[in-house]
Amino acid sequence: MLRKIKVTFIINDEEEKTVEAPIGLSILEIAHSNNLDLEGACEGSLACATCHVMLEEEFYNKLKKPTEAEEDMLDLAFGLTDTSRLGCQIILTEELDGIKVRLPSATRNINYNGFKK
């Protein structure tokens, strides 16, 4: 049986949804499997910034540093913060048990020329 950890998604800065998620999946995959509004227009291929999320510093510091390709995509993200990452690049490990993931209030999808709210 796959080991699971707790992941809490913070939606619109007020609503929280905590789910149990298997280790080895990405934040983007977990959001989609729980019907949360995290776009992921490129389906996790690191070609957009629509799965941009913000983390608490404690969990941000537990992740490997973002690759140059991820940093380039993050530059396009709406509402970028010092603890922003792409959900497709955050793979769950035991060390991330209890992680809180803040979903942005909007995304910028350059394929559609504008913002999604």
Swiss-Prot record:
Binding site for [2Fe-2S] cluster: C42, C48, C51, C88
Cofactor: [2Fe-2S] cluster
GO MF annotation terms: 2 iron, 2 sulfur cluster binding; electron transfer activity; metal ion binding
GO BP, one annotated term: P450-containing electron transport chain
Classification via Pfam families: Fer2
InterPro entries, sorted: 2Fe-2S_ferredoxin-like_sf, 2Fe-2S_ferredoxin-type, Adrenodoxin-like, Adrenodoxin_Fe-S_BS, Beta-grasp_dom_sf
Keywords, in A-Z order: 2Fe-2S, Electron transport, Iron, Iron-sulfur, Metal-binding, Transport
Residue ranges of domain 2Fe-2S ferredoxin-type in the record: 5-107
UniProt keyword annotation of Membrane present: no
Family to which the UniProt record says this protein belongs: Belongs to the adrenodoxin/putidaredoxin family.
Record's function text: Ferredoxin are iron-sulfur proteins that transfer electrons in a wide variety of metabolic reactions.
Name of this protein: 2Fe-2S ferredoxin
Lineage: Bacteria, Pseudomonadati, Pseudomonadota, Alphaproteobacteria, Rickettsiales
Gene: fdxB
